[in-house]
Regions:
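Hydrophobic alpha-helical transmembrane segments in multi-pass integral membrane proteins
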Residues: 63-74, 124-136, 181-194, 243-257, ...
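Residues that define the loop-to-transmembrane-helix transition and helix capping
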Residues: 49-50, 111, 137, 199-200, ...
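Juxtamembrane helix-loop boundary signature in multi-pass membrane transporters
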Residues: 2-26, 122-180, 287-307
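Membrane-interface interhelical linkers
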Residues: 9-30, 39-87, 98-108, 156-174, ...
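Hydrophobic/aromatic residues within transmembrane alpha-helices
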Residues: 42, 51, 104, 130-132, ...
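Hydrophobic core positions of alpha-helical segments in small-molecule transporters
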Residues: 27, 54-55, 89, 116-119, ...
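Hydrophobic/small/kink-forming positions within alpha-helical transmembrane segments
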Residues: 33, 37, 64, 91-95, ...
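Alpha-helical transmembrane segments of compact multi-pass small-molecule transporters, enriched
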Residues: 57-62, 116-130, 208-212, 266-280, ...
C-alpha cells in the first residue's frame, strides 16, 4: 500500500510540476548521448550490420509505442502513393546512415565519428538551399561555419597517431556516408512527406530500416554469427536500442509540455554526453584542439537554433 501511495504522489508530481519538461529534455539528450557508447561496447566483436539489425527490432518497438501514444495509426490508410514513395526512400536513407554509422563506430574513435555524423546538419542546410530554395539566414550561415570548423578540429589527430592510423581510415569514409545519408533522410522528408504525423513517419521509416538491415545480413550470409554473439555484447546492443527508444519518449514528452526551441537545443547537447562518456568509458583523449572544436560545434548549433 505504501508503494502505491508513493507511486501516486510521484505521478501527481510529474503532472503537476510545470518545469518537468526540462527534466525530460535533459533525459532525452542523456539517453541519445549514451546510445553510441552502448552500441560501441556491443559491437566490439560483433558484425556491425548484424548489430544494427538486432537493435532496430528494439527501436521499432519503441517507435510504434510512440504512434500508439499519439493515436496516429488510424491515419495510415490516408497516406497517398507519392508520400509512401518518399517514406520508403527516407527509410532506405536512414538505414544506410545507421549501417554506415555503426560500422564507423566499430572502426574508429567515438569522439571522431560522432562529430562527422553531427555535421550532417551542414549538408542538410546546403541541400535545402540548392534543391528547395530555403533561405540561409545569417544565424544559419554562422552556425554552419562554426560546426564545419569544429568538426574539422575534432577529427584532427597528432602527427604520430596520424602516421599510425594511415592504413586504417575507412572509418572516415563510413562516417561521411553516414552524414550524407542522414541529410538525404531530412531532404526526402521535406520534399515528399506532407500530412504524415511525425511519429508515424518515424515508425514507417524504422520498419523500412529493419527490412533493409536484415536483407543485408541475409545477403552477406552473416545470420549464422548471431548465435556466436556473447551475452554481454547482445545485452549492450539491446540497451543501445532501448536508449534510443527512451530518448524518443522523453523528447516527445518534453515537446508536448515545453518550449520547442529550448527542447531542441537541449537535445542537441547529446554530443557532450557522448564525448564525456567516451573519455570515461573508453579512455579516449580530448586534445585542446578537439575541445575547441567541440565548443565551436555547440556554439554553432545554438546559432542555428536561436537566430
Amino acid at each position: 500500500l505504501r508503494n502505491i501511495v508513493k507511486t501516486k504522489i510521484y505521478y501527481k508530481f510529474l503532472r503537476g510540476n510545470k518545469n518537468m519538461w526540462i527534466v525530460f529534455s535533459i533525459l532525452s539528450a542523456f539517453f541519445a548521448g549514451i546510445t553510441s557508447i552502448l552500441a560501441k561496447i556491443g559491437i566490439k566483436n560483433t558484425n556491425s550490420n548484424v548489430a544494427t539489425a538486432l537493435r532496430t527490432i528494439v527501436v521499432l518497438f519503441f517507435s510504434w509505442i510512440m504512434v500508439c501514444i499519439v493515436g496516429s495509426q488510424g491515419t495510415i490508410p490516408t497516406i497517398d502513393f507519392k508520400t509512401w514513395i518518399f517514406l520508403i526512400l527516407s527509410g532506405l536513407a536512414t538505414g544506410a546512415s545507421w549501417l554506415c554509422y555503426f560500422k564507423a563506430l566499430q572502426m574508429g574513435d567515438i569522439n571522431k565519428v560522432v562529430p562527422i555524423d553531427k555535421s550532417s546538419t551542414i549538408l542538410t542546410i546546403l541541400l535545402a538551399f540548392l534543391l528547395l530554395h530555403e533561405e540561409i539566414t545569417m544565424g544559419k550561415f554562422i552556425g554552419v561555419a562554426l560546426i564545419g570548423l569544429g568538426t574539422f578540429l575534432m577529427i584532427q589527430k597528432s602527427q604520430n597517431k596520424a602516421n599510425k592510423d594511415d592504413k586504417n581510415k575507412l572509418w572516415i569514409m563510413y562516417a561521411i556516408f553516414s552524414a550524407i545519408f542522414a541529410s538525404l533522410t531530412a531532404i526526402f522528408g521535406k520534399i515528399g512527406i506532407d500530412g504524415v504525423e511525425s511519429n508515424l513517419g518515424t515508425a514507417i521509416r524504422t520498419s523500412v530500416v529493419l527490412l533493409m538491415a536484415w536483407a543485408l545480413v541475409l545477403f552477406t550470409k552473416q545470420q549464422h554469427t548471431i548465435k556466436e554473439i556473447s551475452r554481454k555484447e547482445l545485452l549492450f546492443i539491446g540497451l543501445s536500442g532501448i536508449a534510443t527508444g527512451v530518448s524518443w519518449l522523453c523528447y516527445y514528452k518534453a515537446l508536448q509540455d515545453g518550449l520547442t526551441s529550448v527542447v531542441v537545443s537541449i537535445d542537441k547537447l547529446s554530443i557532450l554526453v557522448t564525448i564525456l562518456f567516451s573519455i570515461v568509458v573508453f579512455k579516449e583523449k580530448l586534445s585542446l584542439k578537439s575541445f575547441i572544436g567541440l565548443t565551436l560545434m555547440v556554439i554553432g548549433t545554438f546559432c542555428m537554433l536561436l537566430f
